[in-house]
């Protein structure tokens, strides 16, 4: 089975789009980074290294130090799919990130986005 194209897309090429989406709604790059680090376990320096290396999404998530256990609390629909029902773990992680960035752009408070 072929991998979805997004997995071979570099994280660095999509990252600015996440920041741009947040910025358009008055949110910050720092908030985007906080979300990414919360979900993946990367610290700020490791996140920047992954961006600088141009790793693809598959590698980005495969090398993530630890997916936050509270990611299981992320529910809802993104790209027409319920994130909690996605059976492919790499795709589910990607959709978790999409969902959280979407919530940020919709003005949700960080405490709720980070499932605190």
Sequence positions of predicted segments:
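A charge-rich, low-complexity, intrinsically flexible signal that marks solvent-exposed coils, linkers
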Residues: 1-116
């Amino acid at each position: 089975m072929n991998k979805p194209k997004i997995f071979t897309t570099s994280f660095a090429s999509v990252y600015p789009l996440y920041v741009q989406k947040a910025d358009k709604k008055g949110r910050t790059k720092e908030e985007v980074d906080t979300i990414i680090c919360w979900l993946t376990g990367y610290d700020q320096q490791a996140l920047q290294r992954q961006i600088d290396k141009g790793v693809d999404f598959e590698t980005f998530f495969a090398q993530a130090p630890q997916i936050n256990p509270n990611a299981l609390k992320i529910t809802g629909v993104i790209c027409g799919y319920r994130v909690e029902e996605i059976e492919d773990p790499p795709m589910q992680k990607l959709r978790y990130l999409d969902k959280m960035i979407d919530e940020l752009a919709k003005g949700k408070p960080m405490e709720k986005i980070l499932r605190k």
